[in-house]
From Swiss-Prot:
GO terms for molecular function: DNA binding. Belongs to the HrcA family. Disulfide bonds: none annotated. It comes from Parageobacillus thermoglucosidasius. SUPFAM superfamilies: GAF domain-like (SSF55781), Winged helix' DNA-binding domain (SSF46785). InterPro entries: GAF-like_dom_sf, HrcA, HrcA_C, WH-like_DNA-bd_sf, WH_DNA-bd_sf, WHTH_transcript_rep_HrcA_IDD. Keywords: Repressor, Stress response, Transcription, Transcription regulation. This is Heat-inducible transcription repressor HrcA. It holds the Pfam family HrcA. Negative regulator of class I heat shock genes (grpE-dnaK-dnaJ and groELS operons). Prevents heat-shock induction of these operons. GO terms for biological process: negative regulation of DNA-templated transcription.
Amino acid sequence: MLTDRQLLILQVIIDDFIRSGQPVGSRALSKKHEISLSSATIRNEMADLEELGYIEKTHASSGRVPSEKGYRYYVDHLLSPQRLTQEDIQKIKSIFAERIYDLEKVVQKSAQILSDLTNYTSIALGPAVKDNKLKRIQIIPLNKQTAVAIIVTDTGHVKNHVITVPASVDPSDLEKMVNILNERLIGVPLIDLKDKIYKEVADVLRMHIHNYDSMLKTIADTLDIPQEEKMFFAGKTNMLNQPEFSDIQKVRSLMKMIEQEKDFYRLLRKHNRKGIQVTIGRENQLSGMENCSLITATYSIGKEQLGTIAILGPTRMEYSRVITILNRVASDLSTVLTKWYQNN
């Protein structure tokens, strides 16, 4: 159990190191107005904090820097929310200024604004398409041989696919087919569509449409949408501006980790609990992230959790600011998406 004096010194050390990136010494601490202690007393307390594993000495300086344990304690017990500026709030609102009605585009724009506001790397994991349900199918003829099939889900995901229309299929039959598909498939999870077409809808099509079989496979393939979530990055190179990554080996390790999108995808999938989650350094259990922290939040439509947004930064991250911004974006994103899609 840390004493009040140790808590104060630990908080000031971490705040100062986050701000400056420079190791913090007892002399510098003694000049802080929050700390009315002598350099000798501060040195003794710092020695205890070091022995307890909350701070550590660097080779190049007599000052101390926070350890992973120190950052963890700081995030769990010492942080207070940071007030957002009006400029911050306006930038967040700009995500939703256009009524895009395309969930992927809104999520992608959220990632960009998060990166702009924090100067770190942001990642957004889109909704798992397999969890979406079909809202509407349209087939619009382009000419006698081709048409565009438009698939719209209940969460605004839109897929356009150019298809070949066999010469044996009459335009009026195409319209009938679309009506039957919408009657039978609206509200069906995308993961079940292909199976349902062959097992249930095919018999209805056979009764009403000549040469239905020539279009059946084309439509079924069109509805076979990839089911993994899409992952969007913004500000991939922002981390290179951090002094921690001036070392070329650390840069290589970091960039390799970011480029390994499958590993990063699996990492984000683990961060699917509601609320803000912070993992620091080696807690991330991913090579290349030893000097990084990851802060994540989930977003939803109503009570249905859809995806994850995250900020990747150095362990010397502005935790208070980033958590406040991420929490606001996740909350606003959930509110707006619920308003747009839940009742449609």
